[in-house]
A protein has these predicted regions:
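Conserved, structured core segments of small domains
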Residues: 1-102
């Protein structure tokens, strides 16, 4: 990886404000959440991401950050995190051994 920042795998799931009667894109604050995530991708902070097929809404992200503290602080700025639509379930440091993310 050279001088690149480490990678992390993050699993997020629906929070207490998630409305079970609505689809993901119909949740309150979807546009603000999408704009926030697009900005993280433009900054190369978010490398990959998207929903997982579970009964409860879960999403997986591959992020690049100097450390877990910085990562959690940035994710806490997500409008969906601030309003309880989404919450972080797990964070794992990740070493890429197969393939390339660049």
């Amino acid at each position: 990886m050279g001088g690149e920042l480490p990678y992390f795998v993050v699993i997020n799931e629906q929070g207490p404000a998630w409305d079970e009667k609505r689809s993901m894109r119909d949740q309150k604050g979807w546009t603000e959440h999408a704009v926030f995530m697009d900005a993280l991708a433009d900054e190369h902070f978010a490398i990959l991401g998207g929903p997982l097929k579970y009964s409860k809404h879960r999403a997986m992200l591959v992020l690049s950050a100097p450390n877990e503290g910085v990562l959690r602080k940035r994710l806490a700025e997500d409008p969906w995190m601030r309003t309880g639509v989404l919450r972080t379930l797990e964070v794992y440091p990740w070493e890429v051994l197969i393939g390339k993310l660049t």
